[in-house]
């Protein structure tokens, strides 16, 4: 397939600027929009998360549940909860719960 995207153009309050994909920390789906967290800011973009995900490197960006995608480069640590599903702690302090499928995938990736 095509090479993963390395840059996107985001609009924010009337300005448009390039955002390098490696700066994206995580993203969350919000109906037809996606909230992208990067550089300590949150950007609301008018594109569905699945559409964006299809253009990203799957070794770096992991879909942890239906409405969240994380960049492993910005994960501080992960810890299993009582249901043995992983809680993902991001470097900015955000905690995102991984579903069973993602928890299994992440465990398999661990060496």
Residue spans of the language-model regions?
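Basic, polyanion-interacting recognition surfaces, primarily
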Residues: 1-111
